[in-house]
UniProtKB/Swiss-Prot annotation:
PANTHER family, alphabetized: 60S RIBOSOMAL PROTEIN L27A (PTHR11721), LARGE RIBOSOMAL SUBUNIT PROTEIN UL15Y (PTHR11721:SF28)
HAMAP family on file: Ribosomal_uL15 (MF_01341)
Chain intervals with Basic residues compositional bias: 1-14, 21-30
Species per Swiss-Prot/TrEMBL record: Arabidopsis thaliana (Mouse-ear cress)
Pfam family, one: Ribosomal_L27A
Domain of life of the organism encoding this protein: Eukaryota
Family: Belongs to the universal ribosomal protein uL15 family.
GO molecular function: mRNA binding; structural constituent of ribosome
A GO cellular component entry from the record: plasmodesma
GO BP terms: flower development; inflorescence development; post-embryonic development; translation
UniProt-annotated stretches for the region Disordered: 1-38
Protein name: Large ribosomal subunit protein uL15y
Keyword terms: Ribonucleoprotein, Ribosomal protein
Length: 146
């Protein structure tokens, strides 16, 4: 009865079992770990880990992260910040005030459209030109805070 043997069982009894005569399947022929990344393993490092070696640009040593902290909100999300009861009461004469800093945003950007015939006053630390233009075109106003 013939049985299909695995490769390593087939090789048993043949001196070095397919692993050669000198190295005999020993130790670390290519070096350990990431050895040779700039030399004999360079092709693999470049192919599978591009950018692993080398430097880019300059580091900002004493960067104050809070100085650059500026969470943003787009125009199309502004109306969703208004509570439902305030939305119901709003009219041309009684427009809602949206203070974006109370919702955790500092800057208003101009992506998207505002709802038709629903002007409102936006209070923010920063605002882009396009956002300001769209809010004013819709009949609203912008208040900048410190």
């Amino acid at each position: 009865m013939a049985t299909a043997l695995k490769k390593n069982r087939k090789k048993r009894g043949h001196v070095s079992a397919g692993h050669g005569r000198i190295g005999k399947h020993r130790k670390h022929p290519g070096g350990r770990g990431n050895a040779g990344g700039m030399h004999h393993h360079r092709i693999l490092f470049d192919k599978y880990h591009p950018g692993y070696f080398g430097k880019v640009g300059m580091r900002y040593f004493h960067k104050l992260r809070n100085k650059f902290f500026c969470p943003i909100v787009n125009l199309d999300k502004l109306w969703s910040l208004v509570p439902e009861d305030v939305k119901a009461k709003s009219s041309k004469d009684n427009v809602p005030l949206i203070d974006v800093t109370q919702h955790g945003f500092f800057k208003v950007l101009g992506k998207g459209h505002l709802p038709e015939n629903k002007p409102f006053v936006v209070k923010a630390k920063l605002i882009s030109k396009t956002a300001e233009k769209k809010i004013k075109e819709a009949g609203g106003a912008v208040v900048l805070t410190a």
